[in-house]
Amino acid sequence: MISSPSGSSKEKNTLFPIFLKLAGRRCLIVGAGKAAEEKVPALLASAATVSVVAPAATPKIQGWARDGKLFWSKKRFESQDLDGIFLAVVATSSKAVNRAAFQEAEQRGILCNVVRDRSYCDFYYPAVVRRGPLQIAISTAGHSGALAQRLREELEYQFGPEWEDLLRWLGAVRSSLL
């Protein structure tokens, strides 16, 4: 249903906003092209244990593998690649592989995101503003990544680098009071 800009849509936003602790958790990326490459930095920044499965990879993904930042299996996706995985991101050019990987992840209770296909997503990547411990996430529920990025840029201006120092100071004050 398409609604007017006034917000008369009856569609409910049932997404649950959450920040996950991924440190040490196993995350799998199926595919190693540009779309997959874009998802890697956020997982690495979260201290996740990242594995990539794909027959070929972009030079950047190959570099991360060489540097020991992630594990790259040079092969096609198989269902056993999901063994022990907490979260999966699927970013191949094959709709059949994307669908199969999502369905297998769903059967195993693994959170999964198929890049650029809202119908096969348990979660969406938000646009994020980071200022030290402050993180502001913006989601359009997969409707418009461009709008989310524009809002991120506006918030980055509104919440400049000085917020990092302020928040660290507030954290120190809070700790001294507890």
Where are these regions (language model features)?
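Short loop/edge segments at beta-strand edges and connector loops
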Residues: 54, 72-76, 116
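Glycine-rich, highly charged phosphate/nucleotide-binding loops
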Residues: 65-83
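An accessory alpha-helical subdomain
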Residues: 142-178
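Hydrophobic beta-strand scaffold residues
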Residues: 50, 72, 111-112
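Residue-level detector of alpha-helix initiation sites
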Residues: 33-35, 95-96, 142
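Hydrophobic, well-ordered beta-alpha structural blocks that scaffold small-molecule cofactor pockets
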Residues: 1-56, 61-64
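ADP-ribose/adenylate-binding Rossmann-like module
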Residues: 87-94, 98-125
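Structural motif
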Residues: 26, 86-87
